[in-house]
């Protein structure tokens, strides 16, 4: 892609927009940054853009496809692209191979980040410079996707891709790609369920070596079956059950591959590792977190699909530690008869992720902190499905009504405490105190809110950090010493 002397409008000067602006300027482009909140922006309003002289637009995920400036650019025939599309078209040759570094792309409603991190860790253990990039939150502009794509030292890029980014991306031809799952999320942004799925499916288009899909998700399986990939590209389904031919899964306590990606013939069972080796994906009693096991299977299939050394990759995967705010025990209070454990899963920002989190625990053992910015979601199905696990619920957030209504209609016998949303600074302290009134030995206080965090917190990480602090304080005050 030649951008010298081209005029590019950057819509939104967050980390990715600012980084891309720098990359484009270094290549001789004339960049116009538009952001009403950033003093360094060239313009504060799209009304001030001289569209007659614009060649390209980079749109931030904050702007949906029906935003007026997007429609105006498209009306004029100006390409509207994501940072991902720009990065793909600007990528440079690796200094050792003389060709662009392979990209492994991971998308899905949930599980993207853990899968991307596992993939990177295994490839790094194999001696490759394989950073994570893309939708993974980072304030480091040197590791933005546009910077990584134009760095000749990287051997592989492990790219987390959101549906927002994929909407304005059209030319990707990934080396390996995965869709972890698809559930209703961001439907208002995309304009419906089918549009959302169609944007997710772009990771499979023209993939070269392997596409990895959730064989237990009917929609993802459909997208994989329909995917138009390069000749010879392997399609690998992952399952938490015994795998069929073409799949990788769990059989008799072992990770077993029947897809051929681990070196055997398609349909031939190849035992890779005992599931008991993955203690980091399990409860203290050894019971596995199903969604983290699914992420591990996905990542393993991706790196083997790229041709990584199997034994080295498996060794790295068995020592992988999930990142913060993902089903992480942050405090434990000794009480009469046992203990109460506090688990932070703040990254569970939608109902699908919260369901996976809740389903990891025994019946009637969870005091659930739920709520936040619902984004138009309804929770009746979630509450009905997980009522057997929930002992009590504590509802936070400014958008509480959807969660309140779900409990009233689907689980009226479960006690619910509603936290006054007025004081953001103390909301988590009050929520944890309320949980303490329900908790007894053997219980789990689980913060997996099923909602976004921006109504009362800076981010899901801020929400998780405040929960951890409140949990530790409660444990010190109320625990037996």
Curated annotation (Swiss-Prot):
It is found in: Cytoplasm. Gene3D superfamilies: Mur ligase, C-terminal domain, Mur-like, catalytic domain, NAD(P)-binding Rossmann-like Domain. One of its GO terms (cellular component) is cytoplasm. One of its GO terms (molecular function) is UDP-N-acetylmuramoylalanine-D-glutamate ligase activity. ATP binds at residues 108-114. It catalyses: UDP-N-acetyl-alpha-D-muramoyl-L-alanine + D-glutamate + ATP = UDP-N-acetyl-alpha-D-muramoyl-L-alanyl-D-glutamate + ADP + phosphate + H(+). The keyword tRNA-binding does not apply. It is an enzyme of class 6 (ligase). Pathway: Cell wall biogenesis; peptidoglycan biosynthesis. The keyword GTP-binding does not apply. GO terms for biological process: cell division; cell wall organization; peptidoglycan biosynthetic process; regulation of cell shape. Keywords: ATP-binding, Cell cycle, Cell division, Cell shape, Cell wall biogenesis/degradation, Cytoplasm, Ligase, Nucleotide-binding, Peptidoglycan synthesis. Its EC number is 6.3.2.9. PANTHER family: UDP-N-ACETYLMURAMOYLALANINE--D-GLUTAMATE LIGASE (PTHR43692:SF1). Belongs to the MurCDEF family. Cell wall formation. Catalyzes the addition of glutamate to the nucleotide precursor UDP-N-acetylmuramoyl-L-alanine (UMA). This is UDP-N-acetylmuramoylalanine--D-glutamate ligase. The lineage of its organism: Bacteria, Bacillati, Actinomycetota, Actinomycetes, Bifidobacteriales.
């Amino acid at each position: 892609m030649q951008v010298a002397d081209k005029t590019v409008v950057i819509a939104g000067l967050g980390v990715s927009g600012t980084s891309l602006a720098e990359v484009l300027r270094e290549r001789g482009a004339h960049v116009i940054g538009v952001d009403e909140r950033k003093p360094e922006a060239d313009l504060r309003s799209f009304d001030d853009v001289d569209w007659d002289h614009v060649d390209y637009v980079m749109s931030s995920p904050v702007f949906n496809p029906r935003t007026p400036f997007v429609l105006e650019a498209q009306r004029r025939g100006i390409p509207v692209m994501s940072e991902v599309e720009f990065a793909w078209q600007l990528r440079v040759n690796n200094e050792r191979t003389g060709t662009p570094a392979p990209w492994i792309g991971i998308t899905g409603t949930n599980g993207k980040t853990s899968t991307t991190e596992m993939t990177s860790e295994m490839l790094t253990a194999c001696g490759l410079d394989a950073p994570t990039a893309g939708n993974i939150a980072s304030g480091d502009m040197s590791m933005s996707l546009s910077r990584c794509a134009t760095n000749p030292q990287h051997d592989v890029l492990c790219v987390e891709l959101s549906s927002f980014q994929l909407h304005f991306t059209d030319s990707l031809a990934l080396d390996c790609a995965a869709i972890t799952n698809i559930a209703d999320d961001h439907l208002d942004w995309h304009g419906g369920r089918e549009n959302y799925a169609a944007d997710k499916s772009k990771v499979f288009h023209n993939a070269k070596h392997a596409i990895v899909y959730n064989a237990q998700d009917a929609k993802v399986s459909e997208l994989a079956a329909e995917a138009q990939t390069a000749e010879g590209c392997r399609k690998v389904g992952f399952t938490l059950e015994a795998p069929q031919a073409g799949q990788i899964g769990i059989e008799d306590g072992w990770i077993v591959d029947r897809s051929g990606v681990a070196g055997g013939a398609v349909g031939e069972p190849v035992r890779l590792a005992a599931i008991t080796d993955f203690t980091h994906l399990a409860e203290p009693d050894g019971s596995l977190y199903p969604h983290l096991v699914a992420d591990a299977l996905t990542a393993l299939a991706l790196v083997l699909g790229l041709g990584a050394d199997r034994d080295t990759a498996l060794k790295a995967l068995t020592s992988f530690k999930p990142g913060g705010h993902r089903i992480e025990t942050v405090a434990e209070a000794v009480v009469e008869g046992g203990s109460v454990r506090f688990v932070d899963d703040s990254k569970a920002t939608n109902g699908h992720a919260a369901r996976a989190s809740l389903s990891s625990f025994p019946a009637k053992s969870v005091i659930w902190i739920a709520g936040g910015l619902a984004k138009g979601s309804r929770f009746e199905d979630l509450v009905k499905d997980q009522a057997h696990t929930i002992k009590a619920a504590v509802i936070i957030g400014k958008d509480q009504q959807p969660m309140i209504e779900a409990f009233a209609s689907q689980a009226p016998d479960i006690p619910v405490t509603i936290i006054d949303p007025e004081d953001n600074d103390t909301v988590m302290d009050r929520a944890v105190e309320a949980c303490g009134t329900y908790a007894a030995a053997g219980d789990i206080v689980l913060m997996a809110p099923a909602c976004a965090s921006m109504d009362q917190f800076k981010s899901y990480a801020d929400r998780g950090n405040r929960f951890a602090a409140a949990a530790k304080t409660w444990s010190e005050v109320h625990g037996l010493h």
